[in-house]
Amino acid sequence: MPALGVVMIVKNESEWLENCLESVCAIADEIVIGDTGSTDNSKQIAAEFKARIMDVPWTDDFAAARNAVLAAATSNWLLHMDADETLDEDGAQAIRDLVDADGDGADAIEVMLANYCDDMRAWLWRPVSPDDPNARGKAGYIAVPLLRLFRNRRRFEYREPVHENITESVVEHGGVIRAEHEIVVHHHGFGKGGNAKAEFYLRIARAKTEARPNDAKAWHD
């Protein structure tokens, strides 16, 4: 039976990490976490879930950090999660079923990311019921399709130091991608960090455009 690994990078995510790992531990054969410099108890929380924790030097490059974790994973299939995200039971079971079927003809699966927020003016914002447990008090969400489940192939790699994605390499190497948008990853920390986070991403983006001044994608990101 194919094995499923959950792969993550974290830094000071103690506020969110336990809920994330609780939502995936029942379906994961391994959990590999790259820590990029936590000073809180993120590592201790991860250890409680028997995660394999590795220190990953931070180089202002999200793709490099994620690829270091991919290289350490041994499972046939990998599920990328962020610490402020969870799966509900139906989504978790659907992912496990796909892995047990070895992708059912696919090499990568695109799921739906629900970014919970109260900004009703945001493009594609959708309201939710006040008693929706996944919303955790938020009025609605913004849905974005993302590739999060994929075969563990060395040629499948993340690219771009910020707004990193693996889709480009999967397509480049002939991988079959299938959309399974009924599987929802619930993103609870959307918008966290405020101005400090925006400045952090801007610094990385500036470095990218300076290194590739003639690359339109670098400027777009």
Model-derived regions: residue spans:
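Catalytic-site signature of metal-activated, phosphate-bearing donor transferases
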Residues: P2, A63-L70, M81, L87-D221
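Short, well-ordered alpha-helix to beta-strand connector turns
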Residues: A28, K50, A73-S75, A106
